[in-house]
């Protein structure tokens, strides 16, 4: 009898030790294959980050992830945050389809079959708000002023619906809007004290924010669509700084026209320049997103390169559209006054500004080597020569794939250097742009056959000398296809995903 009791005690102790064996770092559970199932069983809601120790984006996320974990733990939430070193736990990474770093997945009730992909931003508030939306009601019921104050204080942006009848059609439309937005906390109230505190005497919706004017009152008929539009127009600051944390809000938002102020924080009239930019932004809410970029920051140098800017040329303003075709625009004036920036934006919206195409100077020896060097200024003349078949690599100097291709491309140039009508060429697409070709990836390989109809053929075959030769000898047929590689928007954005073959590129930046 005693031995059985001791056995039960030992098993109970072992179970307790097993649960306690879940190691924590900064309130984040450290998971391995050996304790992953145990963690899922112990926690109803579990957000898991699969990371790599060398990943720059993972390092940038770490303090915000820990802050979110601490906040939820302090609230006594059932939600816990965890992390897995995917380079050590490759079986787990493969099991959950990890192809980039960081990959973040949300597990509910231990369900391993279909965890949700995390889709919000990289700040602690974004993480907490997304998780609360996934685990609770779309809008929190605010029964008194203390609850309302707590909600407003909890996040940079909050939305509260004030409805004397929370079963009304307007209230139902409000809840539909709340369900559609993951990263902003919503509250709903019928309490007269809350109405009074926030100076409302009838039904309405208010967006509270800890920047700019502090609050925005919705006006008009309350419908889901109109509320979503109202929130889109008001949830971001008039001017948002481009950082690792704000990038998802910038690229993931619905506003696809961005004007960027490249401004070193060390410049003497920094406050004045930023103030002018902010004044200009007031007239374009919901139409153009105004973004400030610290041009002195090392992490932003690739963005300067993308716009053909050097640090010494800043402060400067550029505009870009992020629709299907990314197009850049440059102000006609270098003056950075609110009036000049406002005029530039109006002219752009009226369709009176032509795209800005970058070009380097034509090198004196551009055609002296087997691989010809093209720039914006000589591209048309060479690529669309009716008597020549021209095969062009569009590359980025920092791109790892391009560096791997370089010796093969040089050999291809040697192979055809004396050919009467085949030209092998290359163009640095970070410094040169042409209207006839939109480069979406690096490297992009395009073939311009000898003809008068300006035909362009994408190459997507093997990146080998034999593959290229077969393509050329077949007249651009063997290996033709859509181009696909490192997307330009991904190249600009500090993306949440970073796969192994991009690591070399990112480590250089």
From Swiss-Prot:
Topology of the protein relative to the lipid bilayer: Peripheral membrane protein
Disulfide bonds: 55-58, 399-402
Domain Thioredoxin: 20-136, 348-477
Tissues expressed in: In the mammary gland, expressed at higher levels in lactating mice than in virgin mice.
Signal peptide segment: 1-19
Short motif Prevents secretion from ER, span: 506-509
Active-site residues from the entry: 55 (nucleophile), 58 (nucleophile), 399 (nucleophile), 402 (nucleophile)
Post-translational modification comment from the UniProt entry: Phosphorylation of Ser-359 by FAM20C is induced by endoplasmic reticulum stress and results in a functional switch from oxidoreductase to molecular chaperone. It also promotes interaction with ERN1.
Residues where N6-succinyllysine is found: 224, 273
Subcellular localization(s) per the UniProt record: Endoplasmic reticulum; Endoplasmic reticulum lumen; Melanosome; Cell membrane
EC class (word): isomerase
GO cellular component: cytoskeleton; cytosol; endoplasmic reticulum; endoplasmic reticulum chaperone complex; endoplasmic reticulum lumen; endoplasmic reticulum-Golgi intermediate compartment; external side of plasma membrane; lamellipodium
Keywords: Acetylation, Cell membrane, Chaperone, Disulfide bond, Endoplasmic reticulum, Isomerase, Membrane, Phosphoprotein, Redox-active center, Repeat, Signal
Site (Contributes to redox potential value): 56-57, 400-401
Domain of life: Eukaryota
Annotated site, Lowers pKa of C-terminal Cys of second active site, chain positions: 463
GO biological process annotation, one example: protein folding in endoplasmic reticulum
GO MF terms held by the record: actin binding; enzyme binding; integrin binding; procollagen-proline 4-dioxygenase activity; protein disulfide isomerase activity; protein heterodimerization activity; protein-disulfide reductase activity; thiol oxidase activity
Site (Lowers pKa of C-terminal Cys of first active site): residue numbering on this chain: 122
Modified residues (N6-acetyllysine): 202
EC number: 5.3.4.1
Similarity comment: family membership: Belongs to the protein disulfide isomerase family.
Record protein name field: Protein disulfide-isomerase
Annotated organism of origin: Mus musculus
Gene: P4hb
């Amino acid at each position: 009898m005693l031995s059985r009791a001791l056995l039960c005690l030992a098993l109970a102790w072992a179970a307790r030790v097993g649960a306690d064996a879940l190691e924590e770092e900064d309130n984040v559970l450290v998971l391995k294959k050996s304790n992953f199932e145990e963690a899922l069983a112990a926690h109803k809601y579990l957000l898991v980050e699969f990371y790599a120790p060398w990943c720059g984006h993972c390092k940038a996320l770490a303090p915000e992830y820990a802050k979110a974990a601490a906040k939820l733990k302090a609230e006594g939430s059932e939600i816990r945050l965890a992390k897995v070193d995917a380079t050590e736990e490759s079986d787990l990474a493969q099991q959950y389809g990890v192809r980039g770093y960081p990959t973040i997945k949300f597990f509910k009730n231990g369900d391993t079959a279909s965890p949700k992909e995390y889709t919000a931003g990289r700040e602690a508030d974004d993480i907490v708000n997304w998780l609360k939306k996934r685990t609770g009601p779309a809008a929190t019921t605010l029964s008194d002023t203390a609850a309302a104050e707590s909600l407003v204080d909890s996040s940079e942006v909050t939305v509260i619906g004030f409805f004397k009848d929370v079963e009304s059609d307007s209230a139902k439309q409000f809840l539909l809007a709340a369900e559609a937005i993951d990263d902003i906390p919503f509250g709903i109230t019928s309490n007269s004290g809350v109405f009074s505190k926030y100076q409302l005497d009838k039904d309405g919706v208010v967006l509270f924010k800890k920047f700019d004017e502090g609050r925005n009152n919705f006006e008009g008929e309350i419908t889901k669509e109109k509320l979503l539009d109202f929130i889109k127009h008001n949830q971001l600051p008039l001017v948002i700084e481009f950082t690792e944390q704000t990038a998802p809000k910038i690229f993931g938002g619905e506003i696809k026209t961005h004007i960027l102020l490249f401004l070193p924080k060390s410049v003497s009239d920094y406050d004045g320049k930023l103030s002018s930019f902010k004044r200009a932004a007031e007239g374009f809410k919901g139409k153009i997103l105004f973004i400030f970029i610290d041009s002195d920051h090392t992490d932003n140098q690739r963005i300067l390169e993308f716009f053909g800017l050097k640090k010494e040329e800043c402060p400067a303003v550029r505009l870009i559209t992020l629709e299907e075709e990314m197009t850049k625009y440059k102000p006609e004036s270098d003056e950075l006054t609110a009036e000049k920036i406002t005029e530039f934006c109006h002219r752009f919206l009226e369709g009176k500004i032509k795209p800005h195409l970058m070009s380097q100077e034509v090198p004196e020896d551009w055609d002296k080597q087997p691989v010809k060097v093209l720039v914006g200024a000589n591209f048309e003349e060479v690529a669309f020569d009716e008597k020549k078949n021209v095969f062009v690599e569009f590359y980025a100097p920092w791109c790892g794939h391009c560096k791997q291709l370089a010796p093969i491309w040089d050999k291809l140039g040697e192979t055809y250097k004396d050919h009467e009508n085949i030209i092998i060429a290359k163009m640095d697409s970070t410094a040169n742009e042409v209207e006839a070709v939109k480069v979406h990836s690096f490297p992009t390989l395009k073939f311009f056959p000898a003809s008068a109809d300006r035909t362009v053929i994408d190459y997507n075959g093997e990146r080998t000398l034999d593959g290229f030769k077969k393509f050329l000898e077949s007249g651009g047929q063997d290996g033709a296809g859509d181009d696909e590689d490192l997307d330009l928007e991904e190249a600009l954005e500090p993306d949440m995903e970073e796969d192994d073959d991009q690591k070399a590129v990112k480590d250089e930046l």
